[in-house]
Amino acid sequence: MTLTTINLFNNAKDFIIIPAGEVIFEKGGIADYMYVIIEGEVEILIDGKFLDITSDGGIIGEMALIDSSPRSATAIAKTECKLVPVDQKRFEFLVQQTPNFSINVMKIMVERIRKLDALVVSLR
């Protein structure tokens, strides 16, 4: 995400601190929130297998929030993390009122799809 988008959340009062090693959400869980990572690193795992690390300025949990599906992966704090939870109502407000936010979410999702495409090709 760009600095402008990070600044949308930097002064948020509703941040949460997650200690290193704590599960943020689990695969199959209900998606009430996506999270903006203000500080820290989060590991993304599927069935115990490492998929990715997301850090400062990244987002996690957006897919399940967008399509109301169960979580597709587990997220674990690799380091202590400062996260801002974003529920459906807040997400929709940000999408409508802050086009830059929407574009950055799309860019992140496209980047993840490209990584997965490359992985699929490498497995053939």
Residue positions per predicted region:
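Cytosolic regulatory regions built on CNB/CRP/Popeye-like sensor folds
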Residues: 1-124
